[in-house]
Amino acid sequence: MLRIAIAKGRLMDSLINYLDAIEFTTLSETLKNRERQLLLSVDNIECILVKGSDVPIYVEQGIADIGIVGSDILDERHYNVNNLLDMPFGACHFAVAAKPETTNYRKIATSYVHTAEAYFKSKGIDVELIKLNGSVELACVVDMVDGIVDIVQTGTTLEANGLVEKQHISDINARLITNKAAYFKKSQLIEQFIRSLEVSIANA
């Protein structure tokens, strides 16, 4: 049995679409029909559905053998895992966003402090970072901050809140990671899973 930690939400939706496209229907249908279950089984695969930021922790601790998570999570801090494969889905990017008229930044709200700090430091801009755990757009709308650093996929949320993308920081995609011990103990299962994805990609 191979246990996979999968990030809930936007990334899992992208994963399901990808699995449908490559006709990995047993797994995609299991994920679609999950209802409120957080632990699912199909064939020799067991899926645990967790918050994105928790995926590498479950993998690092050996609860999951492999994980599918956004590179944004992995870029925020170091995890003792193997980063095996870039996945061809879940594409989006980090960006600085603000009101259209904003040109100077003194305060920035973000859930991604490390990424924001590294970016503004590289530009020689001294900013105060305010860490929020969600809805960072609101902080800019009510003028608590001058701008935000957040993940942008379509830009719809920014537009709905009267904000615009000011600078593109870096690209994000889904990645497949493994527990270091499991990579050896379950190498055959892991390689079989990866190989099936690669074959599907080649045939797409």
Curated annotation (Swiss-Prot):
This is ATP phosphoribosyltransferase. Catalyzes the condensation of ATP and 5-phosphoribose 1-diphosphate to form N'-(5'-phosphoribosyl)-ATP (PR-ATP). Has a crucial role in the pathway because the rate of histidine biosynthesis seems to be controlled primarily by regulation of HisG enzymatic activity. GO terms for biological process: L-histidine biosynthetic process. Keywords: Amino-acid biosynthesis, ATP-binding, Cytoplasm, Glycosyltransferase, Histidine biosynthesis, Nucleotide-binding, Transferase. It catalyses: 1-(5-phospho-beta-D-ribosyl)-ATP + diphosphate = 5-phospho-alpha-D-ribose 1-diphosphate + ATP. GO terms for molecular function: ATP binding; ATP phosphoribosyltransferase activity. SUPFAM superfamilies: Periplasmic binding protein-like II. CDD domains: PBP2_HisGs. The keyword Amino-acid biosynthesis applies. Lacks the C-terminal regulatory region which is replaced by HisZ. Its main location: cytoplasm. Its EC number is 2.4.2.17. It is found in: Cytoplasm. Heteromultimer composed of HisG and HisZ subunits. Pathway: Amino-acid biosynthesis; L-histidine biosynthesis; L-histidine from 5-phospho-alpha-D-ribose 1-diphosphate: step 1/9. GO terms for cellular component: cytoplasm.
